[in-house]
Amino acid sequence: MRTAYFIFVGALLGVSYAKHHHAARAPIINLQGAEELVAVVREDENIISTVPDFAILSETGPVCNYLLTSQNNEPVPFDIQVVDKYTGAAVLRVKDAATLDCKKPEYNLQVQAVKCDNDNVKSEGVSLKIRVKDTNNHAPEIENPWYTFHVEEGKVVEEVGVLKASDKDCGHPNGEICEYEITNGLKELPFAINNHGVLRTTQPLNFTQSKSYILTVVAIDCAMRKSKSSLVTVHVDEKCVQGITAMNERVNYAPGVGSKLLLPDVSLEFCEKETICEPKSVQSVIELRAGHVTQGCARDTVYDNQTIQSCGLSTATVKLLNEEALTSSAENQILADQGIEFDGARGVTVSDENHQGLIPDHFTLSFSMKHAAGTKDEQSNKQNILCESDDFNMNRHHFSVYIRHCKLEVVLRREAGATSDFRAAEWRWSMPEVCDNEWHSYSLLFNGIDDVNVIVDGKSFKADERNPEILDDWPLHKTKATKTKLVVGACWHGRQQKLAQFFRGQLSSLYLLSGAVESERAIKCAHTCPEQLQFTGVDELLESQSATFSPDQTSLTLKAETSKQIGQMLKRVAYVNTQEKPAPGHRVFLVETEVTCKQDDKKMKLPSSKGYVFVQQAAEPTLSISASSQLKSNQHMVKVGQAMVPDLTITISQNNADGELEDVTQSHKIDYCKMHLQPARDMDVEYFSSPASLIAALNIEFEHDKDGILLRGEESAQGYKEVLSKVHYFNTRPESYAKRVYTVQCAMLKGRVLSNQLFVTMTIDGVTTTTSTTTEAPAPAQPDPIQFNFNSGETALDSLELIERHFEPAFDQLGSSRLQNILEMDLPRPKALLSHHGYDVGQGAIAGGAVAVVVVVCVGFLLVLLVIGVLKMRDTPMPRRRRQKRQSDGGMHWDDSGMNITVNPLDDVEKNGGAIDEFSDEEEEEETDGESECSYRDEEDDVSEDEEDQTEVLPHLDANQRVVGGLEWDDEDAISTNARSYRV
C-alpha cells in the first residue's frame, strides 16, 4: 500500500516537471536549410511571399507573434500575421499606412518568433531581406511646360534648343527617358527631335511662309510611358535677302480671263547698310519675252480678219503659203508651231488662183521665217524664199527674195518695156535676225525701186549708207515667152524644167499685196503682240513714282524712291492676252532691279528674278441638251399634232479660270439643230409642223427631208429651244406605228462643238372607244338631227367657237396627195380653217410663183367672206331650232359610231326668223367663182387610190350626187373649197 502511494506521487511530480520544462523552451524558426528569409515585393503589392515560408519546429511552439526589427532602427513598413501558432505559419504584409518606393530598394530585417504565453520567450533572430521591385507607376515629366526658341530663316539649324525630362521611377526601363516625340508632326513641320531632347530643323525656314511654329513634344521612358505634352514655340527671324522675294515663278493663265497679276505677293529688299549705300532711287524693269507661236506672240495672225479691220490693212492681200492646204501633202512637213519646214530639196508652186502675172515694183510682201546659219557652203548658195522666173526655155529671175551669206536679198528686174536706164535692181540687208534660228517677221515695202523699206518684228530697219547694199542693172531683154512661175522655197529654172536654189528652214504666213504698199503704221499695228504687260496701279502712283511702257508694251520700267515702294508697284504688274485662242505654252518674264546710291550716285544691281507664264489650252464649251426620253401619246394626239420635245432644255457650260464649270448659255449661239426619225419617215403619212411666225422672227431656217427636220442659222439657245419645243409630229394613219424613235442633236462654233445625241421614244397608244351602258344602240338610219344653239347668253357660243370646241379634225377625209399639196404650201389660214391649232405643217417645199399668187388671192377673198359671215352671225340672234336633214333619193344612212359632217365656216346665218338659210344666189356665184380660182381641179385629174376612197368619209352620200335642200354643201364642194371635215 505504501509502495503504491510513492509510485502515484512520483508520477504526479514527473508530469509537473515535464510541463514546466516544455513551457520554458524558446521557439525555433525553421529555415528549412536556408541561411535567411528572402522576399520580393512590387511597389503596388501588399502581400509578400518569403522563401522559405514562415515556420517553427513544432515541438518549440506555440508562437503567437513574430517580431520585425531593423538594424538601423528605421521604421519597418511590414508586419507579420500568424496563421497557425503551432506550426508557425504566418503572412508577411505591408502595413496599411506604409507605401513602398523603389528609392529604398531593399530592407534588411530581423525576425523573432514570440512564445504565446510568455512574450519574453523569443526565438533567436533570423535575417529577412525584402527587395522592392519598381512598377513604373510614375510618368516622365518634362522640366518646363513651355519652351521658346528663335531661329534665323534660310538655313538648317542643328540645335534649336534642348528639352529635359525626368522619371521618378527607378532604373531601367521605368526610370530612364528613351525618346522624345513631336506629336503634331503629322502636319509635316520642318523640325525633328532626337532621343536626348535636342530640337533641330530639317530644312531652311522661310519667314514669309510662316513667322512662327508651335510644337507639342512628349518624353517617353524606356517602358513606353509618355509624359504630358510640353509646348515649344519656334520664332522665325527674318533674314534680309537682297532682291525680290516671295515671287511665284509659275503663273497659270487661262484664255479669256483678261489681265492677271504676275507678282501679287512679291517684296523687294535692299540689305546694304546706309553707310555703304543709302538709296536715292530704285528702278525695276519687267520684260515679257514672247516670241513666235510656241513662245507667245503669234505672227501668223498678222493678216487675220480682226487685225485687218483694226489696223486698216488691205483686203486685197493674198496668202501665198497655205499651211492648211499642205497638211495632207508629203512634200513638206507641217510643224507643231504652224510653220512649214523646207528641207533644201522641195518647194511649193503658187497656183494661178492666188497670183497671176508679174510682181510689179509696188508691192508689200510679209512672211515669218526661222533660219539657221548652216555651213559655209550652204551660206554661199542662194536659198530662195520666193522666186518668180521664166516658165520655159530660160532661167531669168524676174523677182526673188532669198538668203545668201546670212543676208536678206531681193532682186526685182525691170521688164523689157521699161526705160533703158541703169537703175537699182538688187538690195542686200545685213541683219542678225536672218540666221539666229529664231522666228522673226519680215515685211518688204516696195513703193517703187527708189523707195524700199524693211520692217522686222514690227520695227523699221534703220538703213545707212552701207546697209543695205544696192546694186544697179539694166532692164531685161525682150522675148516672145512671157509666162512666169512663182515658187515658194525654191526657184523654177525653165531651161532645165526643174526647181533649184532651195530654201532650208521654216516659213509661215507668206502674204503678198500686189500693186499697192501698206503703210508702216498699219504693218506695225498688225505686228503688235497680243500679249502685253499692264500696270493696274496708275491711280496709286505718287509724285516720285513712274511707270513707263515700251512701244509694244512688252517691257515696263518702274521708278520709286525706296525698295518698299517698288515692291508695292511690282504687285500691280499684270499679264494680258487679247487673243481668243492664244497659242498654249510658256512665256518668260524677267525682273531686273537697280539701286542708285546717294554716295556719288553709285549704282548697285540686285539679283534678277525669272518667272514663267503658262498659257493654257483654250477650253471648248460643252453643249448639252436634255428632255424626257419617253413620251406617251395616242393616235388622236398624233393625228392632230404631238409636240416632239415639249420639255427641251439647251445648256452651254465652260470651265472658268478656277476650273469650275460655269453656265455660258447666254454668250454663245447655236449653229444648227437636227431632229431625225429612226427609221426615216413615211413621206405620205408623216409630217412635221413649224411655228412659222416664231421662225420668221428668228435667224433660223426650217427644212424638211426624208430623215426629219433641220434648223439652221446662228441663233441663241433660247430661240432654238422655243422652236424645237413647238415642233409637232403628225401622222394621218396613226395606227401604222405603235412607237416612234427620233434623235435630237445641236452644234455650235461652226460645227466644232456637238451636243450629246438625245434619243426620244414616242409611244403611240390606241384610241379607247367608250361603250354605252344600254344593250341596244339607237338605229343608225334615224339619228337625231344635230342642233346648234346660237342664242346669246352665258351658255351661248359663237358658231366658230362651237365648231372648234365640239369637232375634231379628221385628216383621213382628205387624200394623201391633196393633203401633201396643201401642207407643202405652208400658208397661214383663217382660224376657222385651222385644224392644227396654230402650227404650220409642211414638207419644206415651196409652191411656184404663179400658184402662190393664186393662193394669196383665194385666201384674201375667203377671209373677206369669213369676216362678213362672222359679223352677220354675231349681229343676228339665233333662235333654237333643229336643223332638218333632207335625204337624197338614195337616202342618207348615219353611222352611230361617229357622224361625219363637213362644216363650211363661210355659211351665213339668216337674220329673219332665226333660221339657217343658204346664201343668196349672188353670194353663191361669187363664192363659186372664188373657189374655182383656188381649187385643185387640175390636180384632181390624176386621182390616187387614196382619193378614190374618199367616199368612205361620208358613206351616206353619193360621190357624184349633190344633196338638195337641208344640206348646204356636198362632199365635192368640201374637197374643193378647203373646208375642214369634223367628226362628231
From Swiss-Prot:
Comp. bias regions, Acidic residues: 918-951
Gene that produces this protein: casy-1
TM ranges: 851-871
Locations listed in the record: Golgi apparatus membrane; Perikaryon; Cell projection, Axon
Biased composition (Basic and acidic residues): 886-896
Name of the featured protein: Calsyntenin-1
Phenotype upon gene inactivation: Defects in associative learning, such as temperature learning, olfactory adaptation and integration of two sensory signals. Mutants display hyperactive sensory neurons, resulting in accelerated locomotion and motor circuit activity. Worms show a reduced number of GABA vesicles at the synapse resulting in less GABA release from the presynaptic GABAergic motor neurons.
Extracellular domain ranges by topology: 19-850
GO cellular component, one term: neuronal cell body
Its biological purpose: Cell adhesion molecule involved in associative learning and memory. Acts as a regulator of GABAergic synaptic transmission at neuromuscular junctions by regulating GABA synaptic vesicle precursor transport: possibly functions as a cargo adapter for unc-104-mediated transport of synaptic vesicle precursors. Promotes localization of isoform c of daf-2 (daf-2c) to synaptic regions by acting as a signaling adapter between klc-2 and daf-2c.
Domain Cadherin span(s) in chain numbering: 66-142, 143-257
Organism listed in the record: Caenorhabditis elegans
Membrane topology reported for the UniProt record: Single-pass type I membrane protein
Segments of this protein annotated with the region Disordered: 878-959
PANTHER family xrefs: CALSYNTENIN (PTHR14139), CALSYNTENIN-1 (PTHR14139:SF2)
Sites where a glycan is attached: N206, N305
Record-stated family: Belongs to the calsyntenin family.
